[in-house]
Amino acid sequence: WKTAKYIAKTEQVDLLVVELSALLHDIADSKFHDGDESIGPQKARAFLHTLEIEDNVINHVIRIIENISFKGGKEAQTFQSTELDVVQDADRLDALGAIGIARTFNYGGFKNREIYNPTIPSDLNMTKEEYKKSTAPSINHFYEKLLLLQELMNTATGKAMAAKRHQFMESYLEQFYSEWEGTL
């Protein structure tokens, strides 16, 4: 939410749409609901109706929620808006850098995944369904998603922030492999 507001300062956006989307986009996240992508938008819509938000704002927020996530594969994004660009950049930035690394290993632990297994290569050609069902080690996630995000950023501010976080993750991986091999 804070990152979305920060990026929004440099863009011409409806700040209410940005803030609501940033706050609600992970409500009932599909990865915690057996991949069901309809629960989050339904819950967000129901909540927004309790606030007496205008229908056009609700519809815009829901479209953002439906289109924000990285889903793997080569699926093209069909809905576009500057508000989506801002919130999507903020969401992607959450996956990068120090916090992104912490989240990666936290989720990997939740899913009982290995931290690293050098015999399991990263798969950069997964379909959306394969990505959602992947049980690969957490380190693979860096190559299958995290290190790809910098090139997917939408806004100039998001790109600049992503570059710093991307570099940090590359340094982290270099350190990780040195420690894994016992050379550092």
Where are the regions a protein language model picked out?
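Amphipathic alpha-helical interaction segments
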Residues: E11, S30-D34, L51, D55, ...
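His-Asp-centered metal-binding catalytic motifs of divalent-metal-dependent phosphohydrolases/nucleases
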Residues: L15-H33, G40, V61-K71
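Residue-level detector of well-ordered alpha-helical segments, enriched
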Residues: L16-E19, V57-V61, G97, F142
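Alpha-helical phosphate/pyrophosphate-handling elements in metalloenzyme active cores
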Residues: W1-V18, S30, I39, K43-L51
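Hydrophobic, well-structured mid-protein blocks that either form specific transmembrane helices
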Residues: F47, L51-V87
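Conserved strand-to-helix beginnings and helix N-cap segments that scaffold or border functional pockets
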Residues: H33-E37, A98-I99
